[in-house]
């Protein structure tokens, strides 16, 4: 008896062996570590062990399984999609999630804080650094032409 795993690449061989009247046993494909393997197993309705990598978390979420909120970006995103309360983190992803949830975020001195404040329509003091000049320019404020490169570019 010949044992062949039926895959797209091996289907021609399968038909050739069947034509020769050889007994052929087909087996299902084990869930592979690569993305396409997990997707195929999921489409076939097989149970796939939730992996630690992004694709595993996504599949578990699609199956409706409970996924532990991870500290990494993908964990925060999944928790947000499930409607769970996520503690606002100091890093960019935390500020973004808090902003999407409509929470009040303290305007930070860093670029992301200024961007969020600008999106919320808050008044932001024009800073001397590049991001401050850019925001002031976007708001249509008059910006004094500076001697430095960024000021000249924005004024132009």
Curated annotation (Swiss-Prot):
Residues 22-36, 43-55, 62-74, 81-93, 100-112, 119-131, 138-150 form a propeptide. Keywords: Repeat, Signal, Virulence. It comes from the Eukaryota. VicA1 is processed by several endopeptidases including kexin proteases as well as the cluster-specific peptidases vicP1 and vicP2 to produce 7 identical copies of the hexapeptide Gly-Leu-Lys-Leu-Ala-Phe, that are further modified to yield victorins. After being excised from the precursor peptide, the core peptides are cyclized and modified post-translationally by enzymes encoded within the gene cluster. Pathway: Mycotoxin biosynthesis. Disruption phenotype: Abolishes the production of victorins. Residues 1-21 form the signal peptide. Ribosomally synthesized cyclic peptide victorin precursor, part of the gene cluster that mediates the biosynthesis of the secondary metabolite victorin, the molecular basis for Victoria blight of oats. The vicA1 translated product contains a 7-fold repeated peptide embedding the hexapeptide Gly-Leu-Lys-Leu-Ala-Phe, that is converted into the cyclic victorin. This is Ribosomally synthesized cyclic peptide victorin precursosr vicA1. The lineage of its organism: Eukaryota, Fungi, Dikarya, Ascomycota, Pezizomycotina. The gene is vicA1.
